[in-house]
Amino acid sequence: MNALSQYLSLFEANRTAFESVTSPAVNELRLEAFRMLSEATLSGKDATSLETMIAPDRGINVNRIAMPVEIAASFKCAVPHMSTLLGLIIGDSFHATTSLDRQLPDGVTFMSLARASREHPELLTQFGKIAPADKAEVALNNMMWQDGALIHIARGTKVDRPLQLVKIFSGANMPMMAFRRLLIVVEEDASLQLLSCDHTQDRGEYFSDEIVEISLADNARLELCDIEESSLTTSRYSSVWTRLGHDAQINHTTVTLSCGATRNNINVDIVNPGARSRLAGMAIVDKNMRIDNRTSVNHLSEHGTSDQLFKYVLDDEARGKFEGCITVAPGAKFTEAYQTNRNILASKNARMNSNPWLEIYNDDVKCSHGASTGQLDPDALFYMEQRGIPQAEAKVMLMQAFMVDIIDAVGIDGLRDRLRHLVETRFSGADDRSCDACQSHCRQ
Protein backbone atom coordinates (compact mmCIF):
# COMPACT_ATOMS: atom_id res chain seq x y z
CA MET A 1 0.00 0.00 0.00
CA ASN A 2 1.20 3.53 -0.80
CA ALA A 3 2.59 5.13 2.37
CA LEU A 4 0.35 8.14 1.74
CA SER A 5 -2.84 6.08 1.72
CA GLN A 6 -3.17 5.84 5.50
CA TYR A 7 -2.96 9.63 5.81
CA LEU A 8 -5.47 10.26 3.06
CA SER A 9 -7.87 7.85 4.77
CA LEU A 10 -7.23 9.42 8.17
CA PHE A 11 -7.91 12.92 6.86
CA GLU A 12 -11.03 11.84 5.02
CA ALA A 13 -12.44 10.11 8.10
CA ASN A 14 -11.59 13.01 10.43
CA ARG A 15 -11.98 16.01 8.17
CA THR A 16 -14.29 17.79 10.61
CA ALA A 17 -11.75 17.51 13.41
CA PHE A 18 -8.93 18.85 11.23
CA GLU A 19 -11.00 21.77 9.95
CA SER A 20 -12.36 22.71 13.38
CA VAL A 21 -9.04 24.14 14.59
CA THR A 22 -8.11 26.44 11.69
CA SER A 23 -9.63 29.13 9.49
CA PRO A 24 -11.58 28.55 6.25
CA ALA A 25 -8.63 29.88 4.23
CA VAL A 26 -6.29 27.31 5.77
CA ASN A 27 -8.86 24.59 5.26
CA GLU A 28 -8.99 25.39 1.56
CA LEU A 29 -5.28 24.54 1.41
CA ARG A 30 -6.05 21.26 3.17
CA LEU A 31 -8.53 20.25 0.49
CA GLU A 32 -6.16 21.25 -2.31
CA ALA A 33 -3.44 19.14 -0.68
CA PHE A 34 -5.80 16.19 -0.29
CA ARG A 35 -6.69 16.31 -3.98
CA MET A 36 -3.03 16.55 -5.02
CA LEU A 37 -1.85 13.74 -2.75
CA SER A 38 -4.64 11.47 -3.97
CA GLU A 39 -2.72 11.25 -7.25
CA ALA A 40 0.83 11.53 -5.89
CA THR A 41 3.52 9.00 -5.08
CA LEU A 42 6.62 9.33 -2.94
CA SER A 43 10.12 8.36 -4.00
CA GLY A 44 13.04 7.19 -1.92
CA LYS A 45 13.53 4.18 0.32
CA ASP A 46 16.52 5.25 2.41
CA ALA A 47 16.27 5.80 6.17
CA THR A 48 15.71 9.55 5.90
CA SER A 49 13.21 9.60 3.03
CA LEU A 50 9.71 10.87 3.74
CA GLU A 51 8.16 7.61 2.56
CA THR A 52 10.25 5.56 5.00
CA MET A 53 9.51 7.88 7.90
CA ILE A 54 5.74 8.05 7.45
CA ALA A 55 5.25 4.34 6.69
CA PRO A 56 4.97 3.05 10.31
CA ASP A 57 1.54 3.08 11.94
CA ARG A 58 1.77 5.69 14.72
CA GLY A 59 -0.82 7.53 16.74
CA ILE A 60 -1.76 11.13 16.01
CA ASN A 61 -3.63 13.47 18.32
CA VAL A 62 -6.44 14.33 15.92
CA ASN A 63 -8.99 15.13 18.63
CA ARG A 64 -6.61 17.42 20.56
CA ILE A 65 -6.46 15.36 23.76
CA ALA A 66 -4.23 16.96 26.40
CA MET A 67 -0.88 15.18 26.48
CA PRO A 68 0.35 13.84 29.86
CA VAL A 69 3.41 16.02 30.31
CA GLU A 70 4.65 18.01 33.26
CA ILE A 71 5.19 21.40 31.65
CA ALA A 72 6.86 22.74 34.77
CA ALA A 73 9.69 20.26 34.25
CA SER A 74 10.57 22.10 31.06
CA PHE A 75 11.90 25.17 32.81
CA LYS A 76 14.56 23.88 35.19
CA CYS A 77 17.57 24.61 32.99
CA ALA A 78 18.22 28.32 32.75
CA VAL A 79 20.49 29.59 30.02
CA PRO A 80 23.44 31.35 31.66
CA HIS A 81 23.94 34.93 30.51
CA MET A 82 20.92 34.60 28.23
CA SER A 83 17.34 35.78 28.72
CA THR A 84 14.75 34.47 26.28
CA LEU A 85 11.03 34.82 25.60
CA LEU A 86 9.91 31.21 25.73
CA GLY A 87 7.14 29.31 23.97
CA LEU A 88 6.58 25.56 24.02
CA ILE A 89 5.19 23.02 21.58
CA ILE A 90 4.16 19.73 23.19
CA GLY A 91 3.53 17.23 20.43
CA ASP A 92 2.08 19.74 18.01
CA SER A 93 0.20 21.99 20.47
CA PHE A 94 1.53 25.45 21.28
CA HIS A 95 1.69 26.45 24.94
CA ALA A 96 2.68 29.95 26.00
CA THR A 97 4.54 30.21 29.27
CA THR A 98 2.68 32.02 32.03
CA SER A 99 4.54 35.27 31.55
CA LEU A 100 5.04 35.21 27.77
CA ASP A 101 2.14 37.45 26.71
CA ARG A 102 2.96 40.23 29.16
CA GLN A 103 6.69 40.06 28.36
CA LEU A 104 6.36 40.37 24.60
CA PRO A 105 7.29 43.87 23.42
CA ASP A 106 5.04 45.89 21.16
CA GLY A 107 5.17 44.70 17.59
CA VAL A 108 5.92 41.05 18.47
CA THR A 109 3.39 38.23 18.08
CA PHE A 110 4.36 34.77 19.35
CA MET A 111 1.40 32.43 19.58
CA SER A 112 -0.39 29.30 18.40
CA LEU A 113 -0.59 29.25 14.60
CA ALA A 114 -4.00 27.56 14.63
CA ARG A 115 -5.39 30.21 16.96
CA ALA A 116 -3.81 32.98 14.89
CA SER A 117 -5.50 31.64 11.75
CA ARG A 118 -8.88 32.08 13.45
CA GLU A 119 -8.28 35.30 15.38
CA HIS A 120 -5.63 37.19 13.39
CA PRO A 121 -5.89 36.16 9.73
CA GLU A 122 -4.30 39.48 8.74
CA LEU A 123 -0.99 38.14 10.10
CA LEU A 124 -1.10 35.03 7.91
CA THR A 125 -0.89 36.66 4.49
CA GLN A 126 2.37 34.77 3.82
CA PHE A 127 1.05 31.40 4.97
CA GLY A 128 1.21 28.85 2.16
CA LYS A 129 2.91 31.37 -0.13
CA ILE A 130 6.56 30.40 0.48
CA ALA A 131 6.66 26.59 0.71
CA PRO A 132 5.60 25.22 -2.71
CA ALA A 133 2.27 23.43 -2.33
CA ASP A 134 2.93 21.20 -5.34
CA LYS A 135 5.67 19.31 -3.47
CA ALA A 136 4.44 16.17 -1.73
CA GLU A 137 6.25 16.93 1.54
CA VAL A 138 4.56 20.34 1.73
CA ALA A 139 1.16 19.04 0.65
CA LEU A 140 1.21 16.34 3.32
CA ASN A 141 1.86 18.93 6.02
CA ASN A 142 -0.74 21.29 4.50
CA MET A 143 -3.30 18.52 4.87
CA MET A 144 -2.33 17.18 8.30
CA TRP A 145 -1.09 20.03 10.52
CA GLN A 146 -3.26 21.16 13.39
CA ASP A 147 -1.01 23.55 15.29
CA GLY A 148 2.42 25.09 15.50
CA ALA A 149 3.66 28.61 16.07
CA LEU A 150 3.34 32.05 14.51
CA ILE A 151 6.14 34.54 15.03
CA HIS A 152 5.39 37.95 13.54
CA ILE A 153 7.68 40.96 13.95
CA ALA A 154 6.10 44.25 12.91
CA ARG A 155 7.80 46.81 10.70
CA GLY A 156 10.74 48.55 12.35
CA THR A 157 10.66 46.41 15.50
CA LYS A 158 14.03 45.42 16.95
CA VAL A 159 13.53 42.58 19.42
CA ASP A 160 16.22 42.95 22.08
CA ARG A 161 15.66 39.51 23.69
CA PRO A 162 15.84 36.27 21.72
CA LEU A 163 12.69 34.24 21.27
CA GLN A 164 12.97 30.56 22.13
CA LEU A 165 10.70 27.79 20.86
CA VAL A 166 11.10 24.42 22.57
CA LYS A 167 9.43 21.48 20.81
CA ILE A 168 8.96 18.39 22.96
CA PHE A 169 7.64 14.85 22.69
CA SER A 170 7.00 13.29 26.08
CA GLY A 171 4.91 10.83 28.03
CA ALA A 172 3.21 8.85 25.27
CA ASN A 173 2.58 5.15 25.93
CA MET A 174 2.39 4.34 22.23
CA PRO A 175 4.23 5.40 19.05
CA MET A 176 3.23 8.99 18.31
CA MET A 177 3.62 11.50 15.51
CA ALA A 178 2.97 15.20 15.10
CA PHE A 179 2.64 17.48 12.09
CA ARG A 180 3.94 20.92 13.06
CA ARG A 181 3.76 24.18 11.14
CA LEU A 182 5.75 27.35 11.78
CA LEU A 183 5.33 30.73 10.13
CA ILE A 184 7.98 33.38 10.77
CA VAL A 185 7.40 36.85 9.32
CA VAL A 186 9.89 39.68 9.88
CA GLU A 187 8.64 42.87 8.31
CA GLU A 188 10.61 45.74 6.79
CA ASP A 189 13.52 47.09 8.89
CA ALA A 190 12.76 44.63 11.71
CA SER A 191 15.04 42.08 13.34
CA LEU A 192 14.69 38.85 15.33
CA GLN A 193 16.87 36.30 17.11
CA LEU A 194 15.27 32.86 17.44
CA LEU A 195 16.47 29.71 19.18
CA SER A 196 14.47 26.62 18.16
CA CYS A 197 15.02 23.37 20.07
CA ASP A 198 13.80 19.83 19.37
CA HIS A 199 13.80 17.27 22.17
CA THR A 200 12.30 13.98 23.25
CA GLN A 201 12.01 13.51 27.01
CA ASP A 202 11.92 9.71 27.02
CA ARG A 203 12.62 6.74 24.78
CA GLY A 204 9.20 6.51 23.18
CA GLU A 205 8.91 6.10 19.42
CA TYR A 206 8.20 9.53 17.94
CA PHE A 207 8.04 11.16 14.52
CA SER A 208 7.75 14.87 13.74
CA ASP A 209 6.97 16.36 10.36
CA GLU A 210 7.60 20.08 10.23
CA ILE A 211 7.27 22.80 7.62
CA VAL A 212 8.72 26.23 8.40
CA GLU A 213 7.94 29.23 6.20
CA ILE A 214 10.12 32.31 6.68
CA SER A 215 9.43 35.68 5.07
CA LEU A 216 12.00 38.45 5.49
CA ALA A 217 10.91 41.78 4.06
CA ASP A 218 13.24 44.52 2.81
CA ASN A 219 16.18 45.13 5.17
CA ALA A 220 14.91 42.56 7.68
CA ARG A 221 17.32 40.47 9.79
CA LEU A 222 16.94 36.99 11.25
CA GLU A 223 19.40 35.07 13.44
CA LEU A 224 18.11 31.50 13.68
CA CYS A 225 19.66 28.56 15.50
CA ASP A 226 18.04 25.10 15.39
CA ILE A 227 19.25 22.58 17.95
CA GLU A 228 18.18 18.95 18.01
CA GLU A 229 18.89 16.52 20.81
CA SER A 230 16.59 13.52 20.41
CA SER A 231 16.59 9.84 21.26
CA LEU A 232 17.53 6.99 18.93
CA THR A 233 13.83 6.14 18.55
CA THR A 234 12.90 9.58 17.21
CA SER A 235 12.51 10.40 13.52
CA ARG A 236 12.34 13.97 12.26
CA TYR A 237 11.57 15.37 8.81
CA SER A 238 11.94 19.15 8.68
CA SER A 239 11.72 21.51 5.72
CA VAL A 240 12.50 25.22 5.96
CA TRP A 241 11.59 27.59 3.14
CA THR A 242 12.92 31.17 3.27
CA ARG A 243 12.22 34.12 0.98
CA LEU A 244 14.46 37.19 1.24
CA GLY A 245 13.50 40.76 0.44
CA HIS A 246 15.77 43.58 -0.75
CA ASP A 247 18.91 43.71 1.45
CA ALA A 248 17.41 41.15 3.85
CA GLN A 249 19.77 38.86 5.78
CA ILE A 250 19.41 35.44 7.36
CA ASN A 251 22.01 33.61 9.44
CA HIS A 252 20.68 30.07 9.98
CA THR A 253 22.65 27.48 11.97
CA THR A 254 21.52 23.86 12.33
CA VAL A 255 22.97 21.80 15.20
CA THR A 256 22.37 18.05 15.56
CA LEU A 257 23.78 16.74 18.84
CA SER A 258 21.92 13.43 18.82
CA CYS A 259 19.05 11.94 16.85
CA GLY A 260 17.49 8.77 15.56
CA ALA A 261 16.90 9.51 11.88
CA THR A 262 16.77 13.18 10.85
CA ARG A 263 16.28 14.89 7.51
CA ASN A 264 16.70 18.67 7.30
CA ASN A 265 15.73 20.36 4.04
CA ILE A 266 16.84 24.01 3.99
CA ASN A 267 15.70 26.14 1.07
CA VAL A 268 16.45 29.83 0.45
CA ASP A 269 15.14 31.99 -2.39
CA ILE A 270 17.06 35.22 -2.97
CA VAL A 271 14.43 37.05 -4.98
CA ASN A 272 15.53 40.66 -4.44
CA PRO A 273 18.84 42.52 -4.91
CA GLY A 274 21.34 42.73 -2.08
CA ALA A 275 19.98 39.85 0.00
CA ARG A 276 22.41 37.71 2.02
CA SER A 277 22.06 34.14 3.24
CA ARG A 278 24.41 32.26 5.54
CA LEU A 279 23.68 28.60 6.25
CA ALA A 280 25.82 26.62 8.67
CA GLY A 281 25.43 23.23 10.24
CA MET A 282 27.12 20.77 12.53
CA ALA A 283 26.24 17.14 13.20
CA ILE A 284 27.76 14.95 15.92
CA VAL A 285 26.39 11.44 15.54
CA ASP A 286 27.31 7.97 16.72
CA LYS A 287 25.74 4.53 17.35
CA ASN A 288 23.35 3.98 14.43
CA MET A 289 22.15 7.57 14.08
CA ARG A 290 21.19 8.90 10.64
CA ILE A 291 21.54 12.57 9.69
CA ASP A 292 20.74 14.02 6.27
CA ASN A 293 21.08 17.75 5.53
CA ARG A 294 19.99 19.03 2.12
CA THR A 295 20.24 22.64 1.04
CA SER A 296 18.99 24.57 -1.94
CA VAL A 297 19.91 28.23 -2.43
CA ASN A 298 18.36 29.90 -5.46
CA HIS A 299 19.84 33.19 -6.62
CA LEU A 300 17.06 34.82 -8.62
CA SER A 301 18.18 38.45 -8.38
CA GLU A 302 21.42 40.38 -8.77
CA HIS A 303 23.95 41.29 -6.09
CA GLY A 304 22.94 38.40 -3.85
CA THR A 305 25.36 36.63 -1.51
CA SER A 306 25.19 33.17 0.01
CA ASP A 307 27.59 31.08 2.06
CA GLN A 308 27.19 27.49 3.26
CA LEU A 309 29.40 25.57 5.68
CA PHE A 310 28.39 22.15 7.04
CA LYS A 311 30.54 19.88 9.20
CA TYR A 312 29.96 16.35 10.48
CA VAL A 313 31.70 14.06 12.94
CA LEU A 314 30.52 10.46 12.67
CA ASP A 315 31.40 7.58 14.98
CA ASP A 316 30.42 3.91 15.42
CA GLU A 317 27.87 2.87 12.75
CA ALA A 318 26.51 6.36 12.11
CA ARG A 319 25.51 7.50 8.63
CA GLY A 320 25.59 11.03 7.29
CA LYS A 321 24.60 12.78 4.10
CA PHE A 322 25.00 16.28 2.75
CA GLU A 323 23.45 17.34 -0.53
CA GLY A 324 23.60 20.98 -1.48
CA CYS A 325 22.72 22.94 -4.59
CA ILE A 326 23.36 26.55 -5.52
CA THR A 327 21.41 27.79 -8.53
CA VAL A 328 22.23 31.11 -10.17
CA ALA A 329 19.54 32.30 -12.57
CA PRO A 330 20.34 34.15 -15.84
CA GLY A 331 19.35 37.51 -14.35
CA ALA A 332 21.29 37.09 -11.10
CA LYS A 333 24.36 39.12 -12.06
CA PHE A 334 27.14 39.83 -9.55
CA THR A 335 26.18 36.87 -7.39
CA GLU A 336 28.65 35.54 -4.81
CA ALA A 337 27.88 32.00 -3.64
CA TYR A 338 30.06 29.56 -1.71
CA GLN A 339 29.47 26.07 -0.36
CA THR A 340 31.71 23.81 1.75
CA ASN A 341 31.21 20.44 3.42
CA ARG A 342 33.87 18.96 5.74
CA ASN A 343 33.56 15.64 7.55
CA ILE A 344 35.48 13.48 10.03
CA LEU A 345 34.97 9.73 10.29
CA ALA A 346 35.89 8.73 13.84
CA SER A 347 35.43 5.00 13.23
CA LYS A 348 36.04 2.60 10.37
CA ASN A 349 32.34 1.72 10.15
CA ALA A 350 30.93 5.25 9.92
CA ARG A 351 29.88 6.43 6.46
CA MET A 352 29.39 9.84 4.85
CA ASN A 353 27.96 10.78 1.45
CA SER A 354 28.55 14.31 0.18
CA ASN A 355 27.17 15.83 -3.00
CA PRO A 356 27.59 19.61 -3.37
CA TRP A 357 26.92 21.12 -6.77
CA LEU A 358 26.39 24.35 -8.69
CA GLU A 359 24.00 25.28 -11.49
CA ILE A 360 25.16 28.58 -12.95
CA TYR A 361 23.37 30.31 -15.82
CA ASN A 362 25.26 33.61 -15.64
CA ASP A 363 28.90 34.45 -16.35
CA ASP A 364 29.29 37.46 -14.06
CA VAL A 365 29.46 35.59 -10.74
CA LYS A 366 31.86 34.34 -8.06
CA CYS A 367 30.97 30.81 -6.99
CA SER A 368 32.73 27.80 -5.50
CA HIS A 369 31.95 24.51 -3.84
CA GLY A 370 33.92 21.71 -2.23
CA ALA A 371 33.78 18.71 0.06
CA SER A 372 36.23 16.53 1.98
CA THR A 373 35.91 13.48 4.22
CA GLY A 374 38.69 11.95 6.27
CA GLN A 375 39.99 11.02 9.69
CA LEU A 376 41.67 13.05 12.41
CA ASP A 377 45.16 14.20 11.46
CA PRO A 378 47.53 11.52 12.84
CA ASP A 379 50.43 14.00 12.89
CA ALA A 380 48.43 16.38 15.07
CA LEU A 381 47.50 13.53 17.41
CA PHE A 382 51.13 12.42 17.62
CA TYR A 383 52.27 15.97 18.33
CA MET A 384 49.77 16.35 21.19
CA GLU A 385 50.60 12.95 22.67
CA GLN A 386 54.29 13.83 22.67
CA ARG A 387 53.42 16.80 24.84
CA GLY A 388 51.71 14.68 27.45
CA ILE A 389 48.11 14.95 26.31
CA PRO A 390 46.31 11.57 26.51
CA GLN A 391 45.07 10.33 23.15
CA ALA A 392 41.38 10.40 24.13
CA GLU A 393 41.69 13.99 25.33
CA ALA A 394 43.65 14.97 22.23
CA LYS A 395 40.90 13.58 19.98
CA VAL A 396 38.26 15.58 21.85
CA MET A 397 40.34 18.75 21.52
CA LEU A 398 40.82 18.26 17.78
CA MET A 399 37.15 17.55 17.18
CA GLN A 400 36.18 20.61 19.21
CA ALA A 401 38.56 22.74 17.16
CA PHE A 402 37.00 21.29 14.00
CA MET A 403 33.62 22.79 14.98
CA VAL A 404 34.87 26.19 16.17
CA ASP A 405 33.96 28.17 13.05
CA ILE A 406 30.39 26.83 13.10
CA ILE A 407 29.92 27.87 16.73
CA ASP A 408 31.59 31.26 16.29
CA ALA A 409 29.20 32.13 13.47
CA VAL A 410 26.13 31.82 15.72
CA GLY A 411 24.79 35.34 16.10
CA ILE A 412 22.89 34.93 19.38
CA ASP A 413 24.84 36.29 22.34
CA GLY A 414 25.08 33.87 25.25
CA LEU A 415 24.47 30.84 23.07
CA ARG A 416 27.97 30.41 21.68
CA ASP A 417 29.47 29.55 25.08
CA ARG A 418 26.68 27.08 25.78
CA LEU A 419 27.27 25.41 22.42
CA ARG A 420 30.97 25.09 23.18
CA HIS A 421 30.08 23.35 26.43
CA LEU A 422 27.54 21.08 24.72
CA VAL A 423 30.01 20.10 22.00
CA GLU A 424 32.72 19.37 24.55
CA THR A 425 30.30 17.26 26.60
CA ARG A 426 29.14 15.40 23.52
CA PHE A 427 32.65 14.58 22.31
CA SER A 428 33.82 13.55 25.77
CA GLY A 429 31.12 10.87 25.87
CA ALA A 430 29.44 12.15 29.02
CA ASP A 431 26.19 10.36 29.83
CA ASP A 432 24.27 13.56 30.53
CA ARG A 433 23.18 14.97 27.19
CA SER A 434 20.59 17.41 28.43
CA CYS A 435 20.50 20.45 26.18
CA ASP A 436 21.59 23.29 28.44
CA ALA A 437 21.27 25.63 25.48
CA CYS A 438 17.51 25.32 26.03
CA GLN A 439 15.35 26.06 29.00
CA SER A 440 13.88 22.58 28.67
CA HIS A 441 14.96 19.94 31.16
CA CYS A 442 15.18 16.96 28.84
CA ARG A 443 16.56 13.72 30.25
CA GLN A 444 16.93 10.71 27.99
Each model region followed by its residue ranges:
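Conserved beta-strand/loop scaffold segments within soluble protein domains that form the structured core
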Residues: 106-109, 116-389, 403, 407-438, ...
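N-terminal amphipathic, basic helical "cap/leader" segment at the start of enzyme domains
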Residues: 1-139, 309, 315
